[in-house]
């Protein structure tokens, strides 16, 4: 069992139940999935760029990646309907907790000029999204083999009903929020 999953079931869930004043353990917010998305607009001109992005995301997530395709043609961006323009991966269960552990303990502290995560990055329903400007903050990515720096989006979906519940959940996992 993943370290954070064990921590959640044994310590965090009972503590959150008491802190949030919930009657049942099943009401306690929990993380359901983590989605990592990498938009690669340059893939329109060069297919090798998308291959490198997919390989980076496979190393970061540890599982197979889905290539996302454009839904409609946009002349201004020079893309057509169905062209590959990015990649994403959805992590659940143990892989999700292992990724979250690496994100909190290793990747976030390696961000340059990091002063804490803004607590305003919640969507109003307890889900949290953050953008990472460089994929090299993850230890799985070898800096010498990177063709170019790419950003990625990390979306943490929770069962929390409000932003306060979601913030309490992520704070319990030692997320480095500002203030």
Curated annotation (Swiss-Prot):
The gene is rplE. Keywords: Ribonucleoprotein, Ribosomal protein, RNA-binding, rRNA-binding, tRNA-binding. Disulfide bonds: none annotated. Part of the 50S ribosomal subunit; part of the 5S rRNA/L5/L18/L25 subcomplex. Contacts the 5S rRNA and the P site tRNA. Forms a bridge to the 30S subunit in the 70S ribosome. The keyword Ribonucleoprotein applies. Pfam families: Ribosomal_L5, Ribosomal_L5_C. GO terms for biological process: translation. The keyword Magnesium does not apply. One of its GO terms (molecular function) is structural constituent of ribosome. Belongs to the universal ribosomal protein uL5 family. InterPro entries: Ribosomal_uL5 (IPR002132), Ribosomal_uL5_bac-type (IPR020930), Ribosomal_uL5_C (IPR031309), Ribosomal_uL5_CS (IPR020929), Ribosomal_uL5_dom_sf (IPR022803), Ribosomal_uL5_N (IPR031310). GO terms for cellular component: ribonucleoprotein complex; ribosome. It comes from Cellvibrio japonicus (strain Ueda107) (Pseudomonas fluorescens subsp. cellulosa). This is Large ribosomal subunit protein uL5. This is one of the proteins that bind and probably mediate the attachment of the 5S RNA into the large ribosomal subunit, where it forms part of the central protuberance. In the 70S ribosome it contacts protein S13 of the 30S subunit (bridge B1b), connecting the 2 subunits; this bridge is implicated in subunit movement. Contacts the P site tRNA; the 5S rRNA and some of its associated proteins might help stabilize positioning of ribosome-bound tRNAs.
